[in-house]
């Protein structure tokens, strides 16, 4: 082992940190997040009042172009760095004009890494800027400038804007193909949240053109998305509420049918799928208003005390805040962390909702009744759990479960493994200190259209529920026995089928576990590749080919082994490729803010949707994957 001293320390400069660890800066499943970074810059121009149009074009060569009619990126020379503003923005992390409020009052591009990350992870990037009566052009390849900034044309001085076209580098992404549905949902959301914005979308691959412009903004949005009955019948709307520097737009209603649940949050029009302080403020404000209304009107039910979670359980909402200095947890801007936003949103929501409740007593009482029912179910579930604990000082765990030594729920893991054979290998491959293994026999029951009592008649599902310590259809996960619950199935089509059924079961009957980040899908390899003394694992044919290409100059004989299933792997191979914390690949199961997960699984698994399923398979079946 080499000595660890000052010489061992690496200092990554320029865009090297992004290229070295791209997953720290963007979502590497596909280029969608890169597109969003550029769109967010254009939206910032709209929010600042300098733009009203954004055009997105997807080309057949997998390049993407985003153009706006904003002020145009700066092209003058920076006094300190001695390079043009556009080159500085593209090649230096943490450079930008949004760290103060001089140029943008409300912006999402705070970290100053967005567009430079796009440049770093692209084989080529071209920027065209219309500014000061000129059209400027500059080119980058692999993050480096290859063509100096030059004037290529002249335009009227009022004709301004920025156009960026980039080609994602496939070596940094699982797939360089854009997820069209996710992108279109994002664009629609941007247009809904920004009344002044017109977005045009052109997909040359699918020969599709769309335009979004919503003069009414959030008004009627939930009506459009929700088919079930809601309370209130007309969703409650907060329109452009301001305290001076911050602005709040929100629309929400309660709906007993949770299959269509909509919970979307945004900061300066950037989606925050992991929520944050603005959603906490919404939750607190609603709870405070409901609680005060119950006390004022003596509507409390004996022995039932509602909580903030009770008032939020059946809520469908879209909340959008515009603030001057957004702070996010992480570079991908998925969770807002500004503490002052909680109080701003909570105060506004409480005051406005209180007025509405007093003005609409009939609907207000119905809302209180529904929330009280939710609280009653929670209390009953808590009592049931308490009785179980009293009756069973030691939980009677399934006989097939090989448990771990540790009882620290923050560190333990359960692998639900397809097949007894693979289960045996997994038991030998695991770290017995914190990893438990539960083998499944055969295909699991399709539980999508079944209730909790029915699915518990299935021995396999009963074993899963008992092992993890959570009852199906329960919001109480206080007895959860493992921090990570990992689905480990074969990498072939049968394994994907089983993984899909398990994902559907967790989404339908153990949703709280997904919402709290406890469900994962292990990604075992389909191939083992030995090149001389080096060993690689590949998830599929594409990754196999990429590995072979990247390592074509390595000395030694090439040997490729295809695993027919987990059972073909010896414990050492299974440990290294699927279970070892340092080398495995886990995919966290999440509830998307842009995909309609429930609708997709309903179409795939519901008996009544046979025709829809057949149509979908004919059109998109070759692109299906478990996500």
UniProtKB/Swiss-Prot annotation:
InterPro entries: DNA_gyrase_B_C, HATPase_C_sf, Ribosomal_Su5_D2-typ_SF, Ribsml_uS5_D2-typ_fold_subgr, Topo_IIA, Topo_IIA-like_dom_sf, Topo_IIA_B_C, Topo_IIA_bsu_dom2. GO terms for biological process: chromosome segregation; DNA topological change. Disulfide bonds: none annotated. GO terms for molecular function: ATP binding; DNA binding; DNA topoisomerase type II (double strand cut, ATP-hydrolyzing) activity; metal ion binding. Its cofactor is Mg(2+); Mn(2+); Ca(2+). Binds two Mg(2+) per subunit. The magnesium ions form salt bridges with both the protein and the DNA. Can also accept other divalent metal cations, such as Mn(2+) or Ca(2+). The record marks 443, 446, 497, 613 as: Interaction with DNA. Pyrrolopyrimidines inhibit both GyrB and its paralog in topoisomerase IV (parE). The keyword Thylakoid does not apply. GO terms for cellular component: chromosome. Its EC number is 5.6.2.2. It comes from the Bacteria. Topoisomerase IV is essential for chromosome segregation. It relaxes supercoiled DNA. Performs the decatenation events required during the replication of a circular DNA molecule. This is DNA topoisomerase 4 subunit B. It comes from Francisella tularensis subsp. holarctica (strain LVS). The lineage of its organism: Bacteria, Pseudomonadati, Pseudomonadota, Gammaproteobacteria, Thiotrichales.
């Amino acid at each position: 082992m080499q000595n660890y001293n000052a010489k061992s320390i690496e200092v990554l400069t320029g865009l090297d940190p992004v290229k070295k660890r791209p997953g720290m800066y963007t979502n590497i499943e596909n280029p969608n997040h890169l597109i969003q970074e550029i769109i967010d810059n254009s939206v910032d121009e709209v929010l600042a009042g300098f733009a009203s149009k954004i055009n997105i074009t997807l080309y057949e060569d997998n390049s993407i172009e985003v153009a706006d009619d904003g002020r145009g990126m700066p092209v003058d020379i920076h006094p300190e760095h001695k390079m043009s503003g556009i080159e500085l923005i593209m090649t230096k992390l943490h450079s930008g004009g949004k760290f103060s409020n001089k140029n943008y009052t409300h912006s999402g591009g705070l970290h100053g890494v967005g567009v430079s990350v796009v440049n770093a992870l692209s084989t080529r990037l071209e920027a065209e800027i219309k500014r000061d009566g000129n059209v400027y052009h500059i080119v980058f390849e692999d993050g480096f400038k290859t063509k100096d900034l030059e004037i290529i044309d002249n335009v009227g001085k009022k004709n301004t804007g920025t156009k960026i076209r980039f080609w994602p580098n496939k070596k940094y992404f699982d797939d360089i193909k854009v997820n069209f549905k996710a992108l279109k949902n994002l664009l629609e959301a941007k247009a809904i949240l920004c009344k002044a914005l017109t977005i045009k979308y052109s997909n040359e691959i699918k020969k599709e053109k769309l335009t979004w412009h919503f003069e009414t903004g959030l008004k009627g949005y939930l009506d459009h998305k929700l088919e079930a009955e809601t309370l209130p019948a007309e969703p409650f709307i907060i329109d452009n509420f301001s305290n001076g520097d911050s602005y709040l737009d929100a629309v929400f209603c309660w709906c007993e049918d949770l299959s269509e649940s909509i919970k979307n949050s945004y900061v300066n029009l950037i989606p925050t799928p992991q929520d944050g302080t603005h959603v906490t403020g919404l939750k607190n404000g609603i709870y405070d208003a409901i609680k005060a209304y119950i006390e004022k009107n003596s509507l409390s039910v004996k022995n039932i005390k509602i909580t903030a979670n009770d008032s939020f359980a059946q809520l469908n909402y879209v909340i959008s805040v515009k603030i001057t200095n957004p702070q996010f947890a992480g570079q991908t801007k998925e969770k807002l962390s500004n503490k002052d936003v909680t109080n701003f949103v909570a105060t506004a929501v409480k005051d406005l909702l209180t007025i509405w409740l007093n003005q609409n007593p009939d609907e207000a009482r119905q809302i209180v009744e529904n929330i009280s029912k939710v609280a009653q179910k929670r209390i009953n579930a808590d009592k049931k759990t308490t009785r179980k604990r009293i009756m069973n000082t030691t939980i009677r765990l399934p006989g097939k479960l090989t448990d771990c030594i540790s009882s620290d729920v923050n560190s333990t893991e359960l692998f639900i493994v397809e097949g007894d054979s693979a289960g045996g290998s997994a038991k030998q491959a695991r770290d017995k200190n914190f990893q438990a293994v539960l083998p499944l026999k055969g295909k699991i029951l399709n539980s999508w259209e079944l209730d909790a009592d029915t699915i518990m008649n299935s021995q396999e599902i009963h074993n899963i529920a008992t092992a993890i310590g959570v009852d199906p259809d329960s919001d109480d996960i206080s007895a959860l026995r493992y921090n990570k619950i990992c689905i480990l199935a074969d990498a072939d089509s049968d394994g994907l089928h089983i993984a899909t059924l398990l994902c559907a079961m967790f989404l339908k009957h153990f949703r709280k576990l997904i919402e709290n980040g406890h469900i994962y899908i292990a990604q075992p390899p389909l191939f083992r590749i030995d090149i001389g003394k080096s060993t690689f694992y590949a998830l599929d044919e594409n990754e196999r080919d990429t590995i072979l290409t990247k390592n074509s100059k390595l000395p030694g004989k090439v040997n490729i082994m295809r695993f027919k299933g987990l059972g073909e792997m010896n414990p050492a191979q299974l440990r290294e490729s699927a279970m070892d914390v340092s080398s495995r690949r886990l995919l966290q199961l999440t509830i998307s803010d842009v995909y309609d997960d429930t609708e997709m699984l309903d179409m795939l698994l519901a008996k009544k949707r046979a025709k829809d399923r057949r149509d979908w398979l004919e059109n998109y079946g070759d692109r299906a994957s478990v996500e």
